[in-house]
Amino acid sequence: MLWFKNLMVYRLNRDIPLVADEMEKQLDAFSFTPCGSQDMAKTGWVSPLGAHGEDLTHVTNGQILICARKEEKMLPSPVIKQALEAKISKLEAEQSRKLKKTEKDSLKDEVLHSLLPRAFSRFSQTCVWIDTVNNLIMVDCASAKKAEDTLALLRKSLGSLPVVPLTLESPIELTLTEWVRSGELPAGFALMDEAELKAILEDGGVIRCKKQDLVCDEIANHIEAGKLVTKLALDWQERIQMILSDDGSIKRLKFSDILREQNDDIDREDVTGRFDADFILMTGELAALISNTVEALGGEAQR
């Protein structure tokens, strides 16, 4: 099971039918195919079960898991530059003149095409969890751009995807700052030992601390001086640890050993059964975590 490491949370802002069988057909039209000799990158859907499955959707209890794979050809800039300079020098010597910029740009395209078949590939995978019960979509990545790119592929596959980032009623950084200032958190949450504080003014500086008692005079002085907590390490129910950011993203998810080992009684050879059990467990825990976190931060903004 690919336990999520990050959560970028989006709200489906109107009801759309997300039927697994129909989705399967829609995603299949955009399934992953490797780069051809002249492709710089390719993205498409793969089975969440990897080599152990063929279906592009994994569905349980109204929860849908899908995975996008991206292949990128790696062409380091110095390699392109060296090949381009050699080609320019050769042509300028042959023609006894300096090449124009437009000619050099055209040559660069030629160089890229000649190098692509020999380029190494880098593969990455981004999983998307669709919670049809709560009308939420979660993307397992740390970058908003990567999340948006993955959702763009999903939108293209489905034809429509009315989602917006989950927004809260109150600024998150104000709530995080108050938690650190007072040392008092809502039930179920506990401060850990890592935070980032930023000055309200752009040139006012950033403080990052690790392995630090956050309820102390030093941190209090920074808050008193006008800095706000923009990232905060938290423990939830002694089951999940995370970094909560002021943009609403949740990063560096760490599930407790008790959680991860809960389904160890399932035969290891039953890959699908274990995957399914872990998916049910993970989505149940994360749905509760998201709900508790939104409530602790003052609730979702009215739409």
UniProtKB/Swiss-Prot annotation:
Q: Which organism is it from?
A: Erwinia tasmaniensis (strain DSM 17950 / CFBP 7177 / CIP 109463 / NCPPB 4357 / Et1/99)
List the record's Gene Ontology CC terms alphabetically: bacterial nucleoid; cytoplasm
Q: Which gene encodes it?
A: rdgC
Q: What function does this protein fulfil? A: May be involved in recombination.
Q: Which InterPro entries match?
A: RdgC
Alphabetically, which GO biological process terms does the record hold? DNA recombination; regulation of DNA recombination
> Could you tell me where this protein is found in the cell?
Cytoplasm, Nucleoid
Q: Which family does it belong to?
A: Belongs to the RdgC family.
Single annotated GO MF: double-stranded DNA binding
Starting at the broadest rank, the lineage of the source organism is: Bacteria, Pseudomonadati, Pseudomonadota, Gammaproteobacteria, Enterobacterales
Which keywords label this protein? Cytoplasm, DNA recombination
The name this protein carries in UniProt is Recombination-associated protein RdgC
List the PANTHER family hit by this protein, alphabetically: RECOMBINATION-ASSOCIATED PROTEIN RDGC
